[in-house]
């Protein structure tokens, strides 16, 4: 038997424990992948198709508005929110097809978490940058880097709090916690901030990359249970 499962638990201990304790294995799967059972292939295909369609619709809409290539969109905060929302709504919409009420609720809740995690951190960074631009002390390259890091970190935890409150205002269930996988997935926030930057080279990197990352966020929401 092992202690509480976390990111530091050795894999061999997990495997040994799973062999004699199926409940512990389910706890690990729920912690690691935010699901209580293995996702069916049908659900994965539906979630992926939905997220790709949602991302594409959002991209085409902004591209038409800006009269440019979908992968050369000039990203501001509204574009970041719009594309992430399209991807996540699409992923959830695809994932809930033929899902039971319990799974539907979980997919919607994960969608709320993913959207908050994709939109709140860049908004916090933008707000901080607006304030620090007026300060000679912080309006430097080092100051902007510090502002970005602080904004992303603070925004991630704020997003978790907001999404947990929306999904479960009565606090009847255990909160959805940030995990290492979520932190790595937050590269979309870092790239999103780059997309709003004044550096053309960084914008070129962000433009083609953001839709792919947001589509993956939508897929994660749609296949979650």
PLM features per residue range, with description:
Residues 1-225:
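Glycine-rich, hydrophobic membrane-spanning regions of integral membrane proteins that mediate transport
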């Amino acid at each position: 038997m092992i202690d509480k499962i976390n990111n530091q638990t050795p894999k061999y201990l997990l495997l040994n424990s799973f062999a004699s304790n199926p409940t512990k294995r389910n706890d690990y799967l729920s912690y690691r992948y935010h699901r209580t059972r293995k996702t069916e292939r049908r659900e994965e295909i539906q979630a992926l198709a939905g997220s790709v369609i949602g991302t594409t619709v959002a991209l085409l809409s902004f591209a038409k508005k800006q009269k440019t290539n979908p992968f050369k969109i000039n990203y501001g905060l509204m574009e970041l929110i719009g594309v992430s929302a399209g991807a996540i709504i699409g992923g959830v919409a695809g994932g809930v097809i033929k899902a039971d009420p319990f799974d539907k609720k979980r997919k919607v809740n994960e969608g709320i978490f993913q959207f908050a995690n994709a939109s709140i951190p860049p908004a916090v960074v933008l707000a901080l940058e607006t304030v620090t631009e007026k300060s000679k002390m912080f309006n430097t390259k080092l100051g902007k880097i510090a502002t970005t890091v602080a904004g992303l970190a603070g925004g991630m935890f704020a997003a978790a709090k907001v999404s947990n409150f929306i999904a479960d205002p009565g606090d009847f269930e255990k909160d959805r916690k940030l995990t290492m996988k979520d932190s790595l997935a937050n590269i979309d926030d870092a790239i999103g901030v780059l997309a709003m930057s004044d550096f053309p080279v960084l914008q070129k990197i962000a433009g083609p990359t953001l839709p792919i990352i947001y589509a993956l966020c939508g897929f994660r929401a749609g296949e979650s249970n």
